[in-house]
């Protein structure tokens, strides 16, 4: 039996190597990393569940690998027979094992990317920027701008000082991996990285081997499934943990790299600490669009918790700074302040660890920083009191109420050190601290509020009806605007205590009350989703005025659907034409564009092109009115929701639309991929800043008129094709719900938000995330590619010369190239054979021809795509990405087959399966075995024991393997 196992392990390794598309490069370690983690895991699986269960995992892998090699549907049926013959406990273990192996494969790939990056940095050899696996390095970008594009170092420095990248973390429910597991994955990644370090000793290796074994086993023993949905407060705490763990220290570390990169192009001064190069905002606890769980109380709690956390992080660092600032020499300004503070200081403060006695005046910096420490302590305690009790006795003068109060003494210390010739000391930890304060302020992040436009209409309708002037809801757009402007120009209050309020109206008004009560630096933008007209913006301005919000939030319309994007330029023209509004915005406006809903509404092709045109148009209009426009990009993680490699997405934006100001969402699982580890955080900050700078200083070309004309024609055809299938095909919704796990999506408990805006309804009411998620699970990715094939076919059949034009567009126009490359990547991850299996098992016989026609469309679209890109095979220009996908495929295929058969058993209780006896012989004589315990983790399931957990585990595993949920 032992020899047989060695053979099995060898065969897995052999299959791995067969799947790799040739030797990628000399620095290719992916297969090595992957095989090491796999070997460790299989040993653990055998220890915990027996040799035979490990063999079942290997059998599944081999059948999947054979299918991936030959695409023989019989192999899927063999695999299905094997999986359905397992008892429920073993099924859970198999699903859990493959999900776990995919997470390990992701860790191996992350390490491979980091390893290759280090090699390239050492050698100075940077890959082609058009390649989807590489991104801009800040130093390389500076050098390219100066040496290849003839920009002066001063021009680069000035552009960088005037640049702002604002990353907005959202609680979109696409993070399917529990936080407990993410932390364990981080430790596995660290162990593996250290194992491959050059200077490792035999003892180190042994200890790291043990640690790796321990962490892999701990992850496997952790329940992957969230048993209850997270609350908005849970989501906010999870989001804030990234600041505590990586972003807080990552920002000053990154800014030091910026200093170094500037020095290397001849700029001999540091990047100013108060230049807002990187800013952070959040939607966690502020996004109430379709989420009834985000209440005014939640928003208040989230803001106070963030302020408490921020002052606590500053407080935990201030004593280290006091230890460092031991110098006695200072300028007269600081000496006078220190003596004044010394006279009024408390004698002993016993609750401090360091410097608890009165600090003598011959340590002037410590005296100043001691006062900062006292105020930070009080600021933290006051936030805690307000959070817990709703009130605090600590007075305003004892705390920091705005960031300028905290910066002032720190700047005084910095100036004094520089005046005394101690620049080198000033530019150490003190500069890092100043940069943190400038970036994070007192609130850590600025909380955006997002609300549906219809909620504001409801409130104003209640007001106008109460005032006896008619129904606001029924007024025309012109009448609404006229009334809103009249009220905004006047001073009469509109809301009295006797206003009749529904629950929804009260909730909306109470949100404005919270905005008025809390410090203004807690908040960022007020975003109106489903914005369609000028009155939507004026309505929020009026409600802010009504609640006397001291510093009103900037109001940001979010244009999402195709028709709204088309109407956006006219709406912005009308707004900018209003004298009252132009005075209010003071030359600055932000507009948000939604990638998710526009894609769901019209398909990826038409949405991408309309988003491009809308950006061009609204930027042009803003310029005409002398307004600086910031475009806020609401991008998801998946290609279907506007995702893709950051640097490529930015460099493909229309010229003159970023202009040094970028605001973009970082959603769900992308937060972990961007900030889960220190090196990931560093890479994320670098890629956003470098790509934004490059877009401004070396903008992409504008499309030629004939390209625009062709794109317009193709977009009409693509939209028609997409909508004819998704909205006009009478039985499409029925097919979609049968062929995918859409109905079961909510059981994953991955977000606080319901998956539908309205409990009943079809595709229109379904949120973009479960819409994309469902098709990602079946590896058919319909929302991404549907419409492309019809558009290309129409263009080429109309005029054969158009093929040449499309190929030229691909070679020379970044927007078009990126659009095609991202869809090509999705095709590389796709597998219509899995969709065919789902149809065979889950779809009624009369609907199967519909699925067949969609799969024929898939193949035709893929062929057109390859023709336009000039590729013989998918991803032929990106061997590393191709390798990573092909290594994962056999794991994902097992989970796809397991999911299809589990759905069959859930939906058809009469479906007959023949169970084989306990496959773990070690436990055959015992009344139960370790796998049986897993069934009892979900005692309340409405399905047969174990089926629901098996299904959820397959969903999570496939999401990990595709590296996308929704």
Swiss-Prot record:
Protein name: C4 phosphoenolpyruvate carboxylase
UniProt keyword list: Allosteric enzyme, Carbon dioxide fixation, Cytoplasm, Lyase, Magnesium, Phosphoprotein, Photosynthesis
Pathway annotation: Photosynthesis; C4 acid pathway
Species in which this protein is naturally found: Flaveria trinervia
Top class in the EC scheme: lyase
HAMAP family, per database record: PEPcase_type1
Keyword Ion transport found: no
Consequence when changing residue 450 to G: Loss of catalytic activity
Gene name in the database record: PPCA
